């Protein structure tokens, strides 16, 4: 498990690691996340194995901007999309209808996919570095074993997930006390406060 700082060089190394099929850990608004290329089935399944998370639950995708998320989602009516976009960047995850060709290793047993544009500047910069490297969206799931408390520091990632990520982007989380709010984009209903 390698650890790198949050410099522009570190972001390029993280993007290279993602392109090579590696799993990375990085800070978000509240907790550390595990990430990889969402189109790399092997890397996604490795994250699920690290977390001991069943595939049917689905995963969250983050992007530097909405353009990174469009390949995975179907739009809703303009007023609803404007509400969603106004909540970003920030700790607001929305369940949007998934495109029919979105892989089931991302959607799980759902017709929707969870997406957001993170408010943590480093998480957003990581997404931008990945996009510049030819990627787009990035898997984002809390760095923890299923049903266990998530890691909030790089050291906690190492201790809680010893068979965890290949690379840790070592920086502070933004200090939010809770992970992102999850809402159904069609109804606005809060699914996780």
Segments from the language model and where they lie:
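Active-site-adjacent structural elements in enzyme catalytic cores
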Residues: 1-193
């Amino acid at each position: 498990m390698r650890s790198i700082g949050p410099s522009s060089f570190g972001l390029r190394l993280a993007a290279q690691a993602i392109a090579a099929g590696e799993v990375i850990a990085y800070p978000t608004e509240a907790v550390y996340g595990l990430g990889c290329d969402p189109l790399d089935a092997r890397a996604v399944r490795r994250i699920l194995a690290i977390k001991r998370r069943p595939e049917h639950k689905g995963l969250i995708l983050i992007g530097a901007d909405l353009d990174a998320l469009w390949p995975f989602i179907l739009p809703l009516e303009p007023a609803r999309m404007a509400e969603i976009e106004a909540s970003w960047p920030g700790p607001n995850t929305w369940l949007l209808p998934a495109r029919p060709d979105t892989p089931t290793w991302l959607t799980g047993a759902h017709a929707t996919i969870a997406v957001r544009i993170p408010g943590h500047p480093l998480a957003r910069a990581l997404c931008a570095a990945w996009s510049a490297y030819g990627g787009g969206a990035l898997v984002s799931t809390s760095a923890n074993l299923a049903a266990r408390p998530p890691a909030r520091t790089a050291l906690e990632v190492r201790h809680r997930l010893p068979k965890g990520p290949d690379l840790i982007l070592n920086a502070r989380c933004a200090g939010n006390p809770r992970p992102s709010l999850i809402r159904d984009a069609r109804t606005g209903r809060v699914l996780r406060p």
